[in-house]
């Protein structure tokens, strides 16, 4: 027989780093080209005028201007636009 109890193990003790997702530039804000507007998983927000999409679905400005958000279409898609300044 063992003279000591088993050491046991834990199934906890780890946590994932925060992913820093969300809206980074709000409606009406003046931003520069290349600025990140939204970091997201999937396309909760869709690109509109003067907005590009990164490979991780990040939306960013293609021109300097003001950010605006809109809800369009029968499916109520949230779109992000940048109006050139």
Curated annotation (Swiss-Prot):
State any GO BP term from the record.
Answer: translation
Query: Per the database entry, which stretches of residues form a coiled coil?
Result: none
Key word Ribonucleoprotein present in the record? yes
Highest taxon of the lineage: Bacteria
Give a yes or no for keyword Ribonucleoprotein in this entry. yes
| Assigned keywords, A-Z | Ribonucleoprotein, Ribosomal protein
- The Gly residues compositionally biased stretches are 1-10
Q: Which Gene3D superfamilies match?
A: 2.40.50.100
Q: Which InterPro entries match?
A: Ribosomal_bL27, Ribosomal_bL27_CS
Pfam families per UniProt: Ribosomal_L27
Provide GO CC annotations from the record. cytosolic large ribosomal subunit
Please name the GO terms that the record assigns under molecular function: structural constituent of ribosome
Where do the record's region annotations for Disordered lie?
A: 1-20
Family recorded in the similarity comment: Belongs to the bacterial ribosomal protein bL27 family.
Q: HAMAP family attached here?
A: Ribosomal_bL27
Q: What is the protein name given in its UniProt record?
A: Large ribosomal subunit protein bL27
Q: Which organism is it from?
A: Delftia acidovorans (strain DSM 14801 / SPH-1)
Query: Which lineage do the record's taxonomy fields give for this organism?
Result: Bacteria, Pseudomonadati, Pseudomonadota, Betaproteobacteria, Burkholderiales
């Amino acid at each position: 027989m063992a003279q000591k109890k088993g050491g046991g193990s834990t199934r906890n003790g780890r946590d994932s780093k925060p992913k820093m997702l969300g809206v980074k530039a709000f409606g009406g804000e003046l931003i520069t080209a290349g600025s990140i507007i939204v970091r997201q998983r999937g396309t909760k927000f869709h690109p509109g005028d003067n907005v590009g999409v990164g490979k991780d679905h990040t939306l960013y400005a293609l021109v300097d201007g003001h950010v605006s958000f809109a809800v369009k279409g029968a499916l109520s898609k949230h779109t992000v636009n940048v109006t050139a300044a």
